[in-house]
Amino acid sequence: MTTTGINLFSFQRKTKILHLSWFAFFLTFMIWFNHAPLMATLRETFGLTPQEVKTLLILNVALTIPARIIIGMLVDRYGPRIVYSILLAISGLLCLLYAMANSFEQLAITRFLMGFVGAGFVIGIRMVSEWFPAREVGIAEGIYGGWGNF
């Protein structure tokens, strides 16, 4: 097995992109699944029924599959940097709207829209594959996916 040319302690060029990509993925993943540690508080604050909790859990992933296709198309057209930047900005806004929700309906709508954030994975895969040569793409994408899903 050959060693890779990835110096994880470097913040130059491709390694900088790798670190920024996995951190962006980490942020999207954290926003996408922020409801899990908050669910007990949400249940109590909003008086959610077990069915409403299940609905929120389903809504969280309902938009993700079509969103990954849409995001993939946008990445092909506009490039990963622009699309990731826009996705991060939108996901931050959605997270704030979710935090300011006053009813189950507002929680449900914002949770559904936050499913779009789960498409961030697609962007980083493309970005990493553009910056790393074929012999390093596997390890780079492993770092991106592994650290991003921390």
PLM features: what roles do these ranges have?
Residues 110-147:
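Cytoplasmic helix-loop-helix junction between adjacent transmembrane helices
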Residues 28, 57-60, 64, 114-115, ...:
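Structural signature of transmembrane alpha-helices in multi-pass secondary transporters
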Residues 66-105:
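Conserved MFS/SLC helix-loop-helix module at the cytosolic interface between two early adjacent transmembrane helices
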Residues 24-25, 29, 61, 95, ...:
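Helical-face signature of the major facilitator-like transporter fold
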Residues 33, 60-69, 119:
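Residue-level signature of mid-helix packing/kink "hotspots" within the transmembrane helices
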Residues 49-57:
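Juxtamembrane helix-start elements in MFS-like secondary transporters
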Residues 16-50:
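Extracytoplasmic
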